[in-house]
Structures are given as C-alpha cells and as structure tokens.
C-alpha cells in the first residue's frame, strides 16, 4: 500500500531478556521519531484540559466521532488542520470513532466521509473505520460487524491519503486468526496493526459463561497478534488504568491509548503510582479513599497541580476540582509509562511489573502471563 512508503517505519532497538515479546523500538512518522512503548492520551477536541499546556506530551489520540458530531468543531478542524486547532505539535492519531458509533448502533457510517476528514485535518495517523464486536451479541451480528470492517479496510487502505492503521477483532482465537489472515490479504505487513474490541471484554464479561476468564483471553489474543504480525507495531485500543497498561506492555504491546485519566477524574478518582483508584477524601460511602501510605505518595507528587502545595492543599484541590484531577491523573499515566520504559532499558522490567501487578485485580492474570512465558521457553529449549 503506497500511502505508507516513506512516511512510517518501525524498527526494533531492544528486546527484553525475560519477556520474549517485549521490546523497545523507534517509530518514525512524518520525520518525527519516538521511542516505544507509546501511550496516546485520549483527548476530546472541544474540551479542556489541553494537557500539553501543562506538561510535556508527545502523543495524543482524538476521535473522528467527536469531531463529526459537532459541526463547528468539524469545520474548524478541517480548515486549520488538527494540529493547529489543538495547538499541539506532537504526534496525533485520529481514531475513526468505531466504538462510539457502535454504542449508537450505527453501522452505516460512510468510510469515505472518514477518509475526507482525515485528508483535510491531517493527523499523523488515522485508523480504519472499524466496527468493534460486542461480546453480548450473537455470533452472526459480530460476523456482520467484521465483514463491514473488512470492506472498510480494503477501501480505506487503498484510497487513503495519510497512513492508516488496520484493526483486527475476534472473540475466539480461531476468529482472531482469520481476522489477521483477512487483513494480510489486503496488506501483508503493515507498519502498525491494531487490536480492537478489548474494552467490552473487561467491562461486560466478568463471570459470563462465554468468557470464564476474559482477561486471560485478552492475553492470549495479544500474543497471537504479535506472532501474526511480528514486524508491526502493535496498538491495543482503550486501556483504562496504569495497571492494565503495565500488563499490556509486559505482553509485548507497543502502543496503547487511554481516556482513563479523564474518566477517572470525572468520577472523582485520582491515580497514584502502583495504586488503584482512590478518592481524595473519605466520605464514608464505601469507596476507596487515601490511606496513610497513599498520602505519602501524594506528598511527593511533582505534577503541575501538586507541586509547591502542602498535602492538605493537594487533597482539597483534587477533591473539589475536575480539571485538577484530570491533569494530575494524566501526569501519573505518563510518568508510569516513562518509568516502565526506563526499567525496560536497564533490564529490570520484570521486577518492576511484578511490583506493580502483585496485588489487585490483575495479579492473577500477570501470573498467567508468566506461566505462558515459561512454557514458551521450555518449548524453545526442547526444539
């Protein structure tokens, strides 16, 4: 597909000794260069905060859906281009908004309309208009969604004017393998491949009969896509927390996006390194509030909201103001990504992930991931 030529390249720089699929690499897009693993902070184009006005941000994701639904924003983005509209000179992915269209039960979105928006707004990368699967739908409806995604992929990859990311989906390893094969028939070796339909598995399928362990299925799915596209950067869509971020990175995911920093702030939560969601003030409603050890972490936070303030001032501001929580949360997300990258390069990635994931919801899933690593190593020795 000629639209990729000379615009995007992805080259391995470092592979971890313990996790066979984990790597750091260089991604080059439109003469911009960045180290993986990546974290794209989701941003709503017409709303504050603009995080890059508060601290250094390299990568942002916006949604075509959010732009199309607001005519004023659409016109301005198309006139100025998305970088100038946002006042941001880093890398921007524009997602097609397939997940949002799914929630509205809209399957008749015209991929050519999305292509036109991409061409006029000029993000660094676009995403093929995909129709994510729904784990609660019947199999035929999900097959219909994949066929529409495949049709869109063929049309958009052949006619797009900017680099586009194809996305694979599947709620069984057999279906996911077929999805990978279908995309390879269009583009055998895309520089970037996306894995979608992950978010509904986490939030809709806990305890379901079909997915007795949805997170372990996600782990297996990530491994399959990495093996099917070993030379492609792997992006997984819609990761919510820093702990899920570390789990995905430890599996060999090269790139993630998250709106979690904003959504958690909207619910009144803040993030802290290595800790789950916390509410700044204990309101006796059963929600997890700051412990004494959490307060110690908060007292040394250097985010733009917390710096130069007493602990009491930090707690009061984070409890009362959404924007302050959002900026603080995004800072923690970025710092956790940067720390992971540092640990990867100095050879302590395993110890770091083990520390971050040893407690909480993802601890047993990290153990499952480690068991699979051991099995892979034994198989390679036997061969």
Indicate where each model-derived feature is located.
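Short, structured secondary-structure boundary patches
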Residues: 148-150, 275-282, 373-374
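Short, solvent-exposed loop/turn segments at secondary-structure junctions
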Residues: 41-42, 66-68, 98-100, 132-134, ...
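Surface-exposed alpha-helical segments enriched in charged/polar residues
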Residues: 116-119, 151-154, 158, 181, ...
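C-terminal extensions of enzymes
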Residues: 1-30, 34-43, 133, 297-383
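Residue-level preference for long, well-ordered alpha-helices that form the structural scaffold
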Residues: 107, 138-149, 172, 207-214, ...
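Non-catalytic, usually N-terminal nucleic-acid engagement modules in DNA/RNA processing proteins
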Residues: 1-160, 382-383
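Glycine-rich phosphate/ribose-binding loops and adjacent secondary-structure elements
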Residues: 2-4, 159-312
């Amino acid at each position: 597909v000629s639209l990729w030529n000379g615009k995007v390249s992805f080259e391995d720089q470092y592979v971890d000794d313990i996790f066979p699929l984990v790597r750091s690499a260089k991604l080059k897009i439109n003469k911009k260069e960045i180290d993986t693993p990546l974290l794209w902070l989701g941003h709503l184009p017409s709303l504050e905060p603009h995080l890059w006005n508060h601290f250094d941000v390299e990568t942002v994701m916006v949604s075509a859906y959010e732009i199309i639904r607001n005519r004023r924003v659409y016109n301005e983005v198309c006139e100025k281009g998305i970088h100038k509209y946002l006042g941001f000179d880093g890398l921007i992915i524009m997602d097609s908004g397939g997940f949002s269209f799914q929630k509205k039960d809209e399957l008749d979105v015209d991929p050519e309309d999305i292509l036109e928006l991409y061409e006029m707004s000029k993000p660094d990368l676009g995403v093929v208009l995909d129709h994510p699967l729904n784990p609660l739908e019947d199999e035929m409806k999900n097959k219909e969604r994949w066929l529409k995604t495949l049709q869109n992929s063929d049309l958009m990859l052949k006619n797009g004017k900017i680099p586009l990311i194809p996305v694979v989906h599947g709620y069984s390893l057999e279906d996911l393998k077929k999805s990978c094969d279908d995309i390879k028939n269009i583009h055998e070796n895309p520089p970037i491949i996306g894995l979608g339909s992950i978010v509904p598995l986490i939030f809709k399928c806990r305890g379901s009969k079909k997915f007795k362990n949805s997170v372990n299925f996600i782990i297996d799915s990530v491994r399959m896509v990495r093996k099917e596209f070993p030379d492609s950067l792997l992006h997984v869509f819609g990761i919510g927390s820093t702990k899920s971020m570390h789990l995905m990175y430890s599996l060999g995911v090269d790139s993630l996006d998250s709106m979690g920093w904003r959504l958690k702030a909207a619910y009144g939560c803040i993030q802290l390194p290595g800790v789950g969601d916390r509410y700044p003030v204990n309101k006796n409603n059963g929600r997890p509030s700051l412990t004494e050890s959490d307060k110690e972490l908060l007292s040394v936070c250097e985010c733009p909201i917390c710096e130069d303030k007493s602990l009491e001032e930090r707690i009061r501001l984070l409890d009362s103001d959404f924007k302050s929580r959002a900026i603080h949360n995004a800072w923690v997300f970025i710092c956790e990504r940067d720390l992971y990258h540092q640990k990867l390069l100095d050879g302590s990635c395993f110890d770091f992930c083990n520390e971050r994931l040893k407690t909480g919801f993802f601890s047993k899933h990290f153990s499952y991931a480690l068991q699979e690593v051991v099995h892979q190593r034994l198989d390679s020795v036997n061969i």
